[in-house]
Amino acid sequence: MFYVSKVTPFFFALALLNLLISLFIRLSQDTSLFFVSLVFGFVGLTLMGAMYQIIPNSQNRKLSIPKVSYLVFFLILVSFYEFYTGNTESGSLFLFLGSLIFFFHLLLNVKNFYPLTVRFLLASMIYLVLSALFLYLHFKGFLPVQLSVHTLTVGSMLNAIYGVELAWIPMLIMETLNIRKGEKLFTAKQVSTLALLLAFWSMNYKLIALAGLLEFGVALYFLYLNYELFKRKRMPTPPPNVVKIFLFALLFLPLGMLLGIFSASHAQALPFSLRLHLDLILYGFGAFTIFGGMLHLLPRIVWNWKVQEKENPGFTMGDLVNERELQTFLEYSALLYALFLAVDSLFSPLHVISTVVYLVIMALFLKEIHKAFLYIFK
């Protein structure tokens, strides 16, 4: 790694705390706070932390004025303190200010806009700021919460995941992406995202369903590009376990999108279809992609951090993450996630048991990642 972001692990830790909190808030009737904790607190903060690491390295340069990243983290901490103490309007304002500073801080560090992944991440950053602005306007009573949520998930999360996985998966399986097709995906993604967000701005559910079909088509094209990579794969060895986690997560992307389209066009299926849509997209696709990303990124950040401090840090990368145990984590998590979906489909109050099931998944993940966090302080 050319640059090591020392603030990234703290963004990741706060993101995981928000994921934990979301599992309990989902049992309440506070829909807005649930979206704040899961979408903005878990997904959004993971994206911010990851981009503080990925973007400077994509430019082969150190982050300028790194203390600004700590200011951003402080503002984010304040925002979630405000959210969880009932001050949603001030919390969303601090979140927007932190996101805005984050955007300009990283933008000033981008000199080469040509790489495909960089452009995906820049689009993700733009939508991240817009989602925070829309959330603030929601709490002021001007915009629906659905617009802010989908600006982050469809706009920021998917752009970031598409861009990063189109770089990481070919690298990890030693294949080459067809750049021309990747460029087509980028263009189509920006068109489909804009169409879907305009539909949510209008809150016309027929338009949302139609625009959702366009977004679904783009997702299928992304899946096709990944299929092509594995079809051309010359090496007979199985992919790394982190890639297996990414692939497992991808199973839930088209399913979750179809449930979202179905929910928009069949109001009578609510709220069951909407809850399953959230389970598939956020607790399934989003969470397992993030789990894989953290398991790949965090140990490398910590190891390089300690190597920069002293040539022999006294531990190896294998001490931070055990590749063999990742296979076990994936196998148990897959079974538990299937149980989570099944139990969450039950009538109230039995569906509450699903929270316990997902807590076990989180415990298994923390068992794999906790050493990387602990070695920060050694």
Curated annotation (Swiss-Prot):
Presence of the UniProt keyword Calcium in the record: no
Keywords from the UniProt entry: Cell membrane, Membrane, Transmembrane, Transmembrane helix
Entry's localization field: Cell membrane
Primary location class: membrane
Keyword Transmembrane included in the entry's annotation: yes
Transmembrane segments annotated in the record for this chain: 7-29, 33-55, 68-85, 90-108, 115-137, 152-174, 204-225, 245-267, 280-302, 347-366
Domain of life of the organism encoding this protein: Bacteria
A GO-annotated cellular component: plasma membrane
Membrane topology according to the record: Multi-pass membrane protein
Name of this protein: Uncharacterized protein aq_267
Species for this entry: Aquifex aeolicus (strain VF5)
